[in-house]
A protein has these predicted regions:
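Phosphate-group recognition and catalysis centered on beta-loop-alpha active-site segments
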Residues: 1-243
Length: 243
């Protein structure tokens, strides 16, 4: 059976607040092969871990991140929104998948790439987001490992693929079927999917031969993978439970 990579979505968000150091460590303790994190810039250009444009949902401050300095973010969150550099140090030796939801310019991507380089983490970091963001990453780092996020059944244009040069195609999990999975592999790309959280969905995707699953329940995925490896099958068990 092929190695299925278990990626923890924003850490271990069902147990620990997402995109925090504690959440990243919890995910690794639960068996994650890699942790997906969201990276945005503060007003003064410091990459920090935050999915949303504001602090409202997680930190109860309705303040746009781009209006705040890194020091102000630290003060408003008691230091619990880590910088990218802090996250890289805390996960030393482990893979990180950097999602860049707010990246629209090469200068933004370059700042993120620069921090990764300064931390000596190029070999364990890869990047995901939409085409605009990944074109910016490719311009900032010709050697970057990229997972191009794709959300429609219409395939990426060949000219886009030539420009981005992704290693992975990163699909919303509900789009994947056998035909699409076979086509992606035939074209020479690895398949990453996000974010199935039920056992049934995880089993279905594993049976399709995806190479990586990003989930909020990485402990469940790792348990299913261990069970399948122990049985020597590629079915990941019956598909009757949806818990």
């Amino acid at each position: 059976m092929q190695k299925l990579t278990a990626v923890a979505h924003r850490g271990d968000p069902y147990h620990v607040r997402e995109n925090t150091i504690d959440s990243l460590r919890a995910a690794l303790d639960r068996g994650a092969d890699a942790v997906e994190i969201d990276v945005r810039l503060t007003r003064d250009g410091v990459p920090v871990l935050l999915h949303d444009e504001t602090l409202k949902r997680l930190w109860e401050h309705d303040r746009p991140l781009l209006a705040l300095s890194a020091d102000e973010v630290r003060g408003l969150t008691d230091g619990r929104v880590p910088t990218l550099a802090e996250a890289l140090r805390a996960t030393d030796g482990h893979r990180l998948m950097l999602d860049l939801p707010g990246t629209r310019e090469v200068r933004v991507a370059r700042r993120v790439v620069d921090v990764v380089r300064e931390c000596g983490a190029q070999d364990r970091v890869y990047y995901c987001a939409d085409a605009t963001a990944m074109l910016a990453v490719r311009a900032a780092d010709p050697a970057a490992e990229i997972a191009l996020t794709w959300t429609t059944l219409a395939p990426p244009r060949p000219t886009l693929l030539d420009a981005v040069r992704p290693r992975w195609l990163n699909y919303r999990f509900g789009l994947l079927d056998r035909g699409l999975a076979d086509r992606i592999h035939a074209d020479g790309y690895l398949i990453s999917v996000w974010t199935p959280d039920t056992r049934r969905s995880m089993r279905r995707l594993a049976a399709l031969g995806v190479d990586s699953i990003t989930t909020n329940r990485v402990d469940v995925l790792c348990a299913l993978r261990a069970q399948a490896n122990g049985s020597g099958t590629e079915t990941y068990g019956a598909e009757t439970r949806d818990a």
